[in-house]
Structures are given as C-alpha cells and as structure tokens.
Amino acid sequence: MAGSTPAPHGDGPLVGVLALQGDVREHVRVLEGFGARTRLVRQPKDLPGISGLVIPGGESTVMDKLSRQFGIAEPLRAAIDDGLPVYGTCAGLIMLADEIVDAIHDQRGIGGLDVSVRRNAFGSQTASFEVDLDVPALGAPPVHAVFIRAPVVASVGPAASALASLDDGRVVAVRQGALLGTSFHPEVTGDLRFHRLFLDMVEDAGRTL
C-alpha cells in the first residue's frame, strides 16, 4: 500500500481510508467495488480533495499514537468539525468517540461522535463472535455482524442516535449527521449495506476538502 494517488477505479467520489494501521485493504476493496475512487490517508497532505473518510479496524491505541506522530489527528478533527463524512469500524469507532471510558496512557482519539465507548468490551480475540443484527435504517434482512476484540458504545449523547443494539441492549452502531460508527466489521462479511449507507451520506454531503 504505497502512495496516496487515487486508485483508477470508478468515477465515484474520492474516499480516503486512514492507512496508519489495520484492515485497510478490505475497505479499499469494498469502496472500489461500489465505484468510488480511493486514497490512502496518512498525512495532512492526503486530505485535500477527499469527499469522505473511512477509519478501519485495528488497534486503537496504536492508531491513536500514529495519528499524532504523522500529524493527521488535529487536521482530521478540523475536517470532521467542518462536516467531512467519516465512517469508523471497530477501532475506527473508538477513534471517533468523544470519550473512551477505559482509555490507556494518553489515548485521546479524534472525537466528533457524541458517544462514550469501552474498548475490547467482549474480551480477547478468542472471544470474538458473529450475530445477526436488526438495523431498522437498513431494512430487512438482519445484518450479519462480525465482532473482533470489539468495543461497545457505553452511552449515546443527545447529538447521536443508536442504529443497532445487541439483544442485551448494548449499542453497537451509531450515527450523528455525517458520522457513522460500528463496533463490528461489515467489510469482512459480504453484507455491505453500511458501506452503501456511508457512500449515500458522502453523496448527500456533496463536499470535498
């Protein structure tokens, strides 16, 4: 994964994928499958021209540290404040949360989503699981969701809305305006309705940095 030149796929919007760490390629493949163009984003110079951004799953503490080392954290927060559509999956949701209730060391994330999250809420990777989720915003059938060392949304503030919850009531998908977050990994299941929803959000926003 080298360079930040848009991939020659489709003529849709140019969507960045934060490429500091995590399952970057999977998101690129899904986005390009929908006809979007993609750009790997690591530094502030990679932001101008994109119409949306995906923050992939991975290790949130590593991603947080690298985002500051590469100088992308503050410009990205400014872009979010300016209305850039962003979709965060798993660690990406943690990065978007305004509060990380069990943050370690100086972990801060980027923020923007009016939620608090709890890291690794379901235990270690051996405790990963799959479940079908009812997501009214996406209609039938249920979304088959894969949770891998996943966070959970501990609380949803007044600016955000829950899109999906587990049977025990724990929230695992949220939206706030142009921001979208899921605890799980739609990019690995073949059910790509959350990516389609995000691209619709990008189109509705109709903006570029």
UniProtKB/Swiss-Prot annotation:
Pathway as given in its UniProt record: Cofactor biosynthesis; pyridoxal 5'-phosphate biosynthesis
Active-site residue list: 90 (nucleophile), 185 (charge relay system), 187 (charge relay system)
UniProt entry tagged with the keyword GTP-binding: no
Listed GO CC annotations: cytosol; glutaminase complex
Catalytic reaction list: aldehydo-D-ribose 5-phosphate + D-glyceraldehyde 3-phosphate + L-glutamine = pyridoxal 5'-phosphate + L-glutamate + phosphate + 3 H2O + H(+); L-glutamine + H2O = L-glutamate + NH4(+)
Pfam name, any one: SNO
GO biological process: glutamine catabolic process; pyridoxal phosphate biosynthetic process; pyridoxine metabolic process
This protein's UniProt keywords: Glutamine amidotransferase, Hydrolase, Lyase, Pyridoxal phosphate
EC number: 4.3.3.6, 3.5.1.2
Gene3D superfamilies the UniProt entry points to: 3.40.50.880
Entry annotated with the keyword Hydrolase: yes
GO MF terms held by the record: glutaminase activity; pyridoxal 5'-phosphate synthase (glutamine hydrolysing) activity
Binding site for L-glutamine: 58-60, 119, 148-149
Family as reported in the entry's similarity comment: Belongs to the glutaminase PdxT/SNO family.
SUBUNIT field: In the presence of PdxS, forms a dodecamer of heterodimers. Only shows activity in the heterodimer.
Function per UniProt: Catalyzes the hydrolysis of glutamine to glutamate and ammonia as part of the biosynthesis of pyridoxal 5'-phosphate. The resulting ammonia molecule is channeled to the active site of PdxS.
Protein name as it appears in the record: Pyridoxal 5'-phosphate synthase subunit PdxT
Organism (species): Clavibacter sepedonicus (Clavibacter michiganensis subsp. sepedonicus)
